[in-house]
């Protein structure tokens, strides 16, 4: 027996968020599973966009959307309705199993017992028992009545574990009375347990590839399995053997649905076909329809005259089923049969999934292309969609919008759900690496002569957690106003923010606006990593990244006798005009004035006298910088020069020379 608790050991963490609309009424990716509540006609769909949606199948309207159920942050792989439709259980690639109030659509509790993707669920209606299984090879049994009674204070639940699986589990099934549980895995075998004793009773061999779907007969005597090997097999558990192998698909069988009398099989395949087959006479089969993409899930409509089908695409379609007594082959044989198509009874349209993404050189904007060839520009810093460009040439737009500027990577983009998920961390990519000038499109400061540098990662974290007030924090001093956010902008309040282990499990998920809640604030206090609290709560400034470089006279200098090569260190975002100012003020004056400054000083404190009395032109119009035989634009910063012009692993080297009509006396 295992005990589940919500506490977590502190590990390396990352923060992610999704750029999306406040309400996403359409699935934005494939749909993995369906459940129909026959009492009210509500259809529940589990999306690869991490959202469970609820649809009204009784309405003739095209808008069947009722509500979304959101708390997962990765593919929802399976769902089951239980307690006569009052509750729903979901399994996800975020490694959690969640318990929902199906009518109101909110998450009641989260189970974190699995250590990897949770792929499948099974439900015993008569016992109100649910089983979960996944890539961690584990199967857990849950008492539904116990799960629905969990609260914030009563958050410990005991579960039974079925052991013995040697490979990742992709399919799971139980009969209604809960006397048999069957699992299918990449072992290519079926394992059978008695869930009442948690003892394994047998294993069945016959498939040659992964077992993707399973159905157990109500009496627990038969099992029907579908496999990636393209076959459907019927097993007799009493005889412990396969009694029928059915070949009706050209590719893997991914979904199975049985008639009430357990005599007909409806199968969906990677070959996109949905086929009805008589189990006792497999030659008696009929093509229901050919979908537009591989079939992931099947479910009856409310009167069982049709079947709802989901695929890799985001649409959900209902197809009319042939009458079983007319399910016979035509005289033309198998080839003639395939010309018979099904009638589409209904369609719940899905949205487009983002398939391509490019981070522009400014490391603020990304350009995406979706499954409908629509190109969109997103502002990562402000967490918004900036511009819809339509079906334009994607590569040309990227080329047109990419500037010759180099800013370090400070985030990564994940497109797994079909929506842009931005990931911030401290591992391979440092979210505090991007220091930029105020010219980045943010409000100007009061003093335009002040050169303000901002850190993208710091600003974004401050905006995402603007409403978070840690518990037990000191009340603000009346003389010092309570500082919240970043002072420049706010992000959409509906934005989901996720704290998760690096390469691992989700620890906390909340919306930006909910961070002010007592429970959310406490959870953030317990889970937010130190590098987040340092900038959001402590208001510490991330360290500047510095670049060493050499500075030497150009061979064409009018005083070639000077050959000294100075080594300097400066912040990587310093613009080359500051190097020109340094040359003018410190280096050249050092030659003509005995009290001149030290050329080895850092540039950070160097102030230009180029516009002082007696000087008519700024330093960049009097000093010319060269790198790799290229004249450097004074607006470029050091890291951009190193990336685009220097292109070497050795220290950056500049050569300087005076422009025409300018001598060493600065006249």
Swiss-Prot record:
Cited SMART domains: WD40
Presence of the UniProt keyword Repeat in the record: yes
CDD domains (alphabetical): Ubl_WDR48, WD40
This protein's UniProt keywords: Repeat, Ubl conjugation pathway, WD repeat
Stored InterPro entries: G-protein_beta_WD-40_rep (IPR020472), WD40/YVTN_repeat-like_dom_sf (IPR015943), WD40_repeat_CS (IPR019775), WD40_repeat_dom_sf (IPR036322), WD40_rpt (IPR001680), WDR48 (IPR051246), WDR48/Bun107 (IPR021772)
Key word Repeat present: yes
GO terms, biological process: double-strand break repair via homologous recombination
GO molecular function, one term: ubiquitin binding
Pfam annotation, one family: DUF3337
Function per UniProt: Regulatory component of the Usp12-46 deubiquitylase complex. activates deubiquitination by increasing the catalytic turnover without increasing the affinity of deubiquitinating enzymes for the substrate. The complex deubiquitylates the wg/wingless-signaling receptor arr/arrow, which stabilizes the receptor and increases its concentration at the cell surface; this enhances the sensitivity of cells to wg/wingless-signal stimulation.
PANTHER family: WD REPEAT-CONTAINING PROTEIN 48
Quaternary structure, from the entry: Catalytic component of the Usp12-46 deubiquitylase complex consisting of Usp12-46, Wdr20 and Uaf1; regulatory subunit that, together wtih Wdr20, stabilizes Usp12-46. The Usp12-46 deubiquitylase complex associates with arr/arrow; the interaction leads to deubiquitination and stabilization of arr/arrow.
Family: Belongs to the WD repeat WDR48 family.
Stated name of the protein: WD repeat-containing protein 48 homolog
Chain's gene name: Uaf1
